[in-house]
């Protein structure tokens, strides 16, 4: 459901390829020899230390609660752009996204910049000043409790946070 809803949404880009985007995250872990399980939104998460929820656009009943409990109990949740935007009927969730995961991530998204296919931006990590390339979508984040780990390197949002960490519960 998340896949079709995301690919059929009318914005911020028509170039959304859910499987391609998820594969980017899978490959990053695979390159580091980190085993990856692909599980359903309804799966029990208790046996995991880390959960990556790429493009968790559609938040069905119980999903946000499971992720919140997972983090409260000490788990690490990695989220991405296009998370927590729509409910189970593909209607936008009011109150800024990541919707019901806003407190877990400690931030909200003010706006999303859709980059042209050939366009990139930079991520500059705070600690070591390493620079990484980013493309496709760039969220303008407004931090509530989260702390900045990396910032955008160019465009009108240069210096704004793009990689963050938030302590929530024991996670």
Outline where the language-model segments fall.
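Carbohydrate-binding surfaces of carbohydrate-active enzymes
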Residues: 1-171
């Amino acid at each position: 459901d998340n896949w079709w809803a995301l690919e059929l949404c009318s914005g911020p880009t028509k170039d959304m390829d859910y499987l391609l985007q998820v594969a980017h995250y899978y490959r990053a872990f695979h390159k580091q020899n980190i085993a990856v399980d692909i599980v359903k939104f309804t799966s029990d998460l208790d046996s995991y230390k880390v959960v990556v929820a790429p493009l968790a656009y559609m938040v069905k009943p119980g999903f946000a609660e499971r992720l919140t409990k997972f983090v409260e109990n000490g788990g690490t949740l990695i989220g991405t752009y296009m998370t927590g935007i729509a409910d189970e009927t593909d209607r936008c969730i009011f109150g800024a996204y990541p919707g019901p995961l806003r407190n877990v991530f400690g931030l909200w998204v003010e706006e999303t910049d859709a980059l042209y296919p050939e366009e990139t931006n930079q991520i500059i990590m705070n600690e070591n000043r390493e620079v990484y390339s980013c493309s496709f979508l760039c969220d303008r984040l407004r931090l509530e409790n989260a702390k900045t780990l990396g910032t955008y390197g160019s465009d009108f949002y240069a210096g704004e946070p793009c990689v963050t960490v938030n302590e929530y519960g024991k996670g």
